[in-house]
Amino acid sequence: MTIYFYKVWQPYGCFSNFSPHGIHIQDTYWATVEHYYQAQKFVGSKDAAIIPLIHAAATPEEAAALGRCSTRQLRRDWDLVKTQIMREAVLKKFLTHADIREVLLKTGDELLVENSPTDSFWGCGANKAGLNHLGKTLMSVREEIRNLLSLTGIYE
């Protein structure tokens, strides 16, 4: 069975980067994974001044809009680092919040797919043939957490 997720209020909405599960990374608290991810686009770029605005955005939708502005210059290595940045944030989210960690682990070995009708990089896109990098990230994080819990069980 494939598990599709997209909107926060739908089943498995906690898998969305817009879910209200804050994270601490590099001594900074971020309200959502989306806030963190969008801000990281500008680290070291000439438009780095936008980072505090993204951080302070009232909603993940606002953070996304600020980060997606096409007139701003992204960091030079963005295409090389964006999937690792996403993975770091998603892992932190599920290590921080036990309730949603349990939801993720209970998906077993099911295929996780971000059912985005517009994003064929992070999701499956309108034609369902997208790259689904967010789903793949979640499945990788699920496996890493399983391994961590297994090691913890051995040494308790």
UniProtKB/Swiss-Prot annotation:
<protein>
    <recommendedName>
        <fullName>N-glycosidase Npun_R5314</fullName>
        <ecNumber>3.2.2.-</ecNumber>
    </recommendedName>
</protein>
<dbReference type="InterPro" id="IPR012816">
    <property type="entry name" value="NADAR"/>
</dbReference>
<dbReference type="Pfam" id="PF08719">
    <property type="entry name" value="NADAR"/>
</dbReference>
<keyword id="KW-0378">Hydrolase</keyword>
<comment type="similarity">
    <text>Belongs to the YbiA family.</text>
</comment>
<dbReference type="GO" id="GO:1901135">
    <property type="term" value="P:carbohydrate derivative metabolic process"/>
</dbReference>
<dbReference type="InterPro" id="IPR037238">
    <property type="entry name" value="YbiA-like_sf"/>
</dbReference>
<dbReference type="GO" id="GO:0016799">
    <property type="term" value="F:hydrolase activity, hydrolyzing N-glycosyl compounds"/>
</dbReference>
<comment type="function">
    <text>Catalyzes the hydrolysis of the N-glycosidic bond in the first two intermediates of riboflavin biosynthesis, which are highly reactive metabolites, yielding relatively innocuous products. Thus, can divert a surplus of harmful intermediates into relatively harmless products and pre-empt the damage these intermediates would otherwise do. May act on other substrates in vivo. Has no activity against GTP, nucleoside monophosphates or ADP-ribose.</text>
</comment>
<keyword id="KW-0326">Glycosidase</keyword>
